[in-house]
């Protein structure tokens, strides 16, 4: 296989067993990275990703952890270091499952649990992973942390409010960590995603999917592979002077 932009580097992908995380893990492997595929419950799916990565000629390990548990995140980082000796990239793609009924609820009807879940998984889960990997990155004087935000967290929307709260927090976390760890050689960025064709979107009706496809300037949904290409770019030295940014990957949705 040709030498890629990430040859010899080690990437942790949380939520790497399916959806966006799976696409990201495979694209990083195509660019030369060895992979730690974090999963919460999908052991078989995570192992299938590991086998695909190995089929690309890279090393890979599936490691179970809970991103909502700081201790479990520290164990994840420790196992990654014990297995591969370094952590160069952390792509935080573990997220709260999409639920149509929760997304469309009026803000005043959201329960405390519905408000809290995206904060626990998307925001705090990403923060806990960052806490776990940043010490080794700072010590090495290099590293790239990539979070998942959203376009609605920038533009605002009348639905998906609990999700927007968590993703807006991600954007703040990105900027703060970029300032704190930039002097130590670590870059921190986020993606602001629009409508992407992942498995949870199958819960959206065909009519609503068609409506959503008309919203961005490109008049279509994005693919996981298109997101993954941006992640590989941010993880590589091609993005060596980019930090603290929310890279908008939304087909022009924010231009409305």
What label would you give each PLM region?
Residues 216-227, 238:
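A conserved structural motif in NAD(P)-dependent oxidoreductases
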Residues 130, 166, 174:
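Active-site helix of classical SDR
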Residues 101-119, 201, 208, 212:
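Substrate-binding pocket helix/loop in short-chain dehydrogenase/reductase
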Residues 2, 155, 210, 215, ...:
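Short C-terminal tail/terminal secondary-structure segment
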Residues 10, 17-18:
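Conserved glycine-rich cofactor-binding loop
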Residues 135, 179-183, 240:
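Alpha-helical segment proximal to the catalytic Tyr-Lys
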Residues 43, 64-76, 112, 225-226:
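The beta1-alpha1 cofactor-binding region of Rossmann-like NAD(H)/NADP(H)-dependent oxidoreductases
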Residues 108-127, 142, 146, 170, ...:
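Catalytic Tyr-X3-Lys loop
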């Amino acid at each position: 296989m040709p030498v890629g932009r990430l040859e010899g580097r080690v990437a942790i992908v949380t939520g790497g067993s399916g959806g966006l995380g799976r696409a990201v893990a495979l694209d990083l492997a195509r660019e030369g990275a060895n992979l730690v595929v974090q999963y919460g419950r999908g052991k078989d799916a995570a192992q299938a990703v590991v086998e695909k990565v190995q089929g690309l000629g890279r090393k890979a390990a599936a490691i179970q952890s809970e991103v909502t548990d700081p201790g479990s995140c520290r164990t994840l980082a420790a196992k990654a270091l014990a297995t591969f000796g370094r952590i160069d990239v952390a792509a935080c793609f573990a997220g709260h499952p999409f639920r149509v009924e929760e997304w469309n609820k009026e803000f005043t009807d959201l329960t405390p649990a519905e408000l809290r879940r995206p904060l626990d998984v998307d925001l705090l889960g990403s923060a806990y992973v960052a806490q776990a990997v940043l010490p080794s990155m700072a010590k090495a004087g290099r590293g790239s942390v990539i979070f998942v935000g959203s376009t609605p967290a920038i533009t605002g929307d009348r639905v998906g409010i609990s999700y927007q709260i968590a993703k807006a927090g991600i954007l703040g976390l990105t900027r703060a960590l970029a300032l704190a760890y930039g002097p130590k050689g670590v870059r921190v960025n986020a993606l602001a995603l629009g409508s992407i064709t992942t498995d949870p979107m199958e819960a959206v009706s065909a009519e609503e999917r068609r409506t959503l496809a008309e919203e961005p300037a490109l008049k279509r949904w994005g693919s996981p592979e298109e997101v993954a290409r941006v992640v590989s770019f941010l993880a590589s030295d091609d993005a060596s002077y980019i930090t603290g940014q929310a890279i908008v990957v939304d087909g022009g949705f924010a231009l409305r």
